[in-house]
Regions:
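Short, glycine/charged-enriched secondary-structure capping and boundary segments
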Residues: 49-52, 78, 105-108, 128-131
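Fold-independent oxyanion-binding glycine-rich loops
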Residues: 17-18, 38-40, 93-95, 116-119, ...
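ATP/NTP phosphate-donor binding region
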Residues: 1-89
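A glycine/threonine-rich phosphate-anchoring loop and its flanking beta-alpha core
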Residues: 11, 107-147
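Short glycine/serine/threonine-rich phosphate/pyrophosphate-binding segments
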Residues: 20, 43-47, 72, 97-104, ...
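Short, surface-exposed, polar/charged, turn-prone segments marking secondary-structure boundaries
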Residues: 41-42, 62-66, 90-92, 118-121, ...
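Short amphipathic alpha-helical surface micro-motifs
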Residues: 16-19, 43-45, 96, 114, ...
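A short, small-residue-rich loop immediately preceding and capping a beta-strand
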Residues: 82-119
């Protein structure tokens, strides 16, 4: 029997020393109104470099420190922020839960998503799903993405 293997990969992958200083240049085609969903440590690590990459632009940037769990309530909160502020790109900055929250938010709002992993061990940037929890932190579901 023939065994097939499939790999899904991001449309674009950028890596290198101080690559965040090139964030805007590399991602500008996606939009001009950005929601950054960040873990606390991800925000501290990435914020200044990302902001430097936007120097001289008029792009809107909104940073949100998320609640720590990719819960239904947290995702809905981020979706409301997107809608209220007419944002058109979602960025996840941090570990797995921040990234899963960003992927789910972008999916439901039909927006592009950018992943900035700050934890080496997370597989959230590479998987076509998000793990969703209830607001009491019990497991809810897996959200599988079509592409």
């Amino acid at each position: 029997m023939l065994r097939l293997r499939m790999m899904r990969a991001p449309q674009k992958y950028v890596q290198g020393k101080d690559s965040l200083l090139q964030f805007h240049k590399e991602m500008t085609s996606l939009g001009d109104k950005w929601l950054f969903i960040c873990s606390r440590s991800g925000y501290k690590m990435a914020h200044d470099k990302i902001e430097k990459s936007f120097e001289g632009t008029s792009d809107v940037r909104q940073y949100e420190i998320f609640g720590g769990v990719s819960s239904t309530g947290e995702i809905e909160k981020m979706r409301e922020i997107v809608r209220e502020n007419h944002l058109n790109v979602v960025v996840g900055v941090g570990g797995g839960s921040a990234i899963d929250t960003a992927k789910a938010t972008a999916h439901y709002e039909k927006l592009p998503v950018v992943i900035v992993p700050t934890v080496v061990a997370t597989d959230a940037p590479c998987t076509g799903l998000s793990v969703i929890y209830n607001d009491d932190e019990t497991f809810n579901s897996y959200l599988f993405y079509p592409k």
